[in-house]
Amino acid sequence: MVMTDPIADFLTRIRNANQVKHEVLEVPASNIKKGIAEILKREGFVKNVEVIEDDKQGIIRVFLKYGKNGERVITNLKRISKPGLRVYAKRDDMPKVLNGLGIAIISTSEGLLTDKEARQKNVGGEVIAYVW
């Protein structure tokens, strides 16, 4: 089966694993998925990310994070720019997710950045997803 939107699949797998409180999630690797996972780790939404190399495409292992009482750290993930409808943001119109409580993941000429980093570097790009 050919997957038309591997980023949406990745976000859905994280959302589903988070809903049933799995500790670890494994997905097929790609550069953009690695970048998204690293941003989630850097921003404190997941505990850790491991990239396991094999002879094929590799695997990304994401360790999900929960609060003291088992509450989810990731409330939701939403795919914004889709293959059928791309969404771009200029450097002056960078989106804010829940007034700064969440993050927007932006694909820029300088790589994958959060909305805050894109504002600091004064670059625009494709709005990949919102995480809060």
From Swiss-Prot:
Record keyword rRNA-binding present: yes
One GO cellular component, as annotated: ribonucleoprotein complex
Keywords of the record: Ribonucleoprotein, Ribosomal protein, RNA-binding, rRNA-binding
GO MF entry, a single one: rRNA binding
GO biological process, one term: translation
Transmembrane segments: none
RNA-binding among keywords: yes
SUPFAM superfamilies (alphabetical): Ribosomal protein S8
PANTHER family assigned to the protein according to its UniProt record, in alphabetical order: 40S RIBOSOMAL PROTEIN S15A
Family the UniProt entry places it in: Belongs to the universal ribosomal protein uS8 family.
Function: One of the primary rRNA binding proteins, it binds directly to 16S rRNA central domain where it helps coordinate assembly of the platform of the 30S subunit.
Subunit structure: Part of the 30S ribosomal subunit. Contacts proteins S5 and S12.
Name used for this protein in its record: Small ribosomal subunit protein uS8
Species for this entry: Streptococcus pyogenes serotype M1
